[in-house]
Amino acid sequence: MDIDPYKEFGATVELLSFLPSDFFPSVRDLLDTAAALYREALESPEHCSPHHTALRQAILCWVELMTLATWVGNNLEDPASRDLVVNYVNTNMGLKIRQLLWFHISCLTFGRETVLEYLVSFGVWIGTPPAYRPPNAPILSTLPETTVVRRRGRSPRRRTPSPRRRRSQSPRRRRSQSRESQC
């Protein structure tokens, strides 16, 4: 089966794959963040949101995986085999859990639309040749709160300039004047 855990949230595994693996905090840090911000909702018997449910499931999977890894570590005699299992879990499964935890915590913190806009922005940024892109990648916390992901299709109707604005005053000139007055 080809199951994409992000599909119902408007994202894809491919979209998250644009973010480098070292972008995601450690599982421990993500679990601490989830507990600090959302413990009450995660432990509540009430259904809060699909993101809370997905976060609960990811946390439970990680706990079970750590239980299995501990059992394997205690019962595998061969140190080389033990190291292979530990490395596999940390590298492959750990990354998937880190991505899941990050995605759902970010959606709860910033809003799903903002996170999707960030993923698209980062994907465009990383896909642009270095000579043609800004030196710094987009940062999730600095995206405007009113970010909207536009659906493909008709372009929005263009607005005509307000008749009250005099054309001789350019926005740049006004901004620079206001900066000088603030200093």
Curated annotation (Swiss-Prot):
GO cellular component, one term: T=4 icosahedral viral capsid
Subcellular location, record wording: Virion; Host cytoplasm
Keyword presence, RNA-binding: yes
Region of interest (RNA binding), residue spans: 177-183
A Pfam family annotated for this UniProt entry: Hepatitis_core
Keyword Repeat in record: yes
BP terms from Gene Ontology: microtubule-dependent intracellular transport of viral material towards nucleus; symbiont entry into host cell; viral penetration into host nucleus
Source species, domain of life: Viruses
Sequence repeats: from-to residues: 155-161, 162-169, 170-177
Region span, Disordered: 136-183
Positions of modified residues (Phosphoserine): 155, 162, 170
A GO molecular-function annotation: RNA binding
Comp. bias (Basic residues): 149-176
Segments of this protein annotated with the region 3 X 8 AA repeats of S-P-R-R-R-[PR]-S-Q: 155-177
Span of the annotated motif Bipartite nuclear localization signal: 158-175
InterPro entries with a match to the protein in the record: Hepatitis_core, Viral_capsid_core_dom_sf_HBV
Entry keyword set: Capsid protein, Cytoplasmic inwards viral transport, DNA-binding, Host cytoplasm, Host-virus interaction, Microtubular inwards viral transport, Phosphoprotein, Repeat, RNA-binding, T=4 icosahedral capsid protein, Viral penetration into host nucleus, Virion, Virus entry into host cell
Post-translational modification: Phosphorylated by host SRPK1, SRPK2, and maybe protein kinase C or GAPDH. Phosphorylation is critical for pregenomic RNA packaging. Protein kinase C phosphorylation is stimulated by HBx protein and may play a role in transport of the viral genome to the nucleus at the late step during the viral replication cycle.
Subunit structure: Homodimerizes, then multimerizes. Interacts with cytosol exposed regions of viral L glycoprotein present in the reticulum-to-Golgi compartment. Interacts with human FLNB. Phosphorylated form interacts with host importin alpha; this interaction depends on the exposure of the NLS, which itself depends upon genome maturation and/or phosphorylation of the capsid protein. Interacts with host NUP153.
Family stated for the protein in its record: Belongs to the orthohepadnavirus core antigen family.
Name the record gives this protein: Capsid protein
